Amino acid sequence: MTLSRPGLTAKIRPYRAGDWAAVYDVCIETGNAGQGVRGRYSTDDLLPDIFAGPYLYLEPGHAYVLDNGERAVGYIIGTAGTPDFVAAYEERWLPRLRTRYQPLSRPPVTEEEHRLDVMFHP
């Protein structure tokens, strides 16, 4: 699908592995109800590691990007089935994250801790 208006042409296309960084950038720039989250957490990758990366890694066939002709500037991601996705998330995605993030040993207090709680308890 191609979207066009004066000065802007973009198309929706299937996600490609080379889009990973651009999708992460979009998530960082829009992760707070359309506002950016850069510098808000201890790492800018926190939100995309929770809300974009697992879908790109586990189910890339259910990911699409809005491409402006230079790079992905938007995305839509999904899963074929939540129970299977959650199982794969726990078995294949979480082990990759444990090198950078640690589960909480107490109830979450800060906004970042609440995000980590979501990460480790999908």
Describe the function of each predicted region.
Residues P14, D25-Y41, P54-Y55:
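Helix-loop element at the rim of GNAT/NAT acetyltransferase active sites that forms part
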Residues M1-A10:
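Basic/polar N-terminal segments that are highly enriched at the extreme N-terminus
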Residues K11-D25, A80:
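A short beta-loop-alpha structural element at the N-terminal edge
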Residues R40, G78-P83:
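A conserved beta-strand-loop-helix scaffold within acyl/acetyltransferase catalytic domains
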Residues V65, R71-A80:
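Conserved beta-strand in the GNAT
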Residues Y41-A63, G69:
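Active-site rim helix/loop that mediates acceptor-substrate recognition in acyltransferases
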Residues A17-G18, G69-R71:
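Short strand-connecting beta-turns/loops that link adjacent beta-strands
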Residues T82-P122:
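Conserved acyl-donor/pantetheine-binding loop and adjacent beta-alpha core of acyl/acetyltransferases
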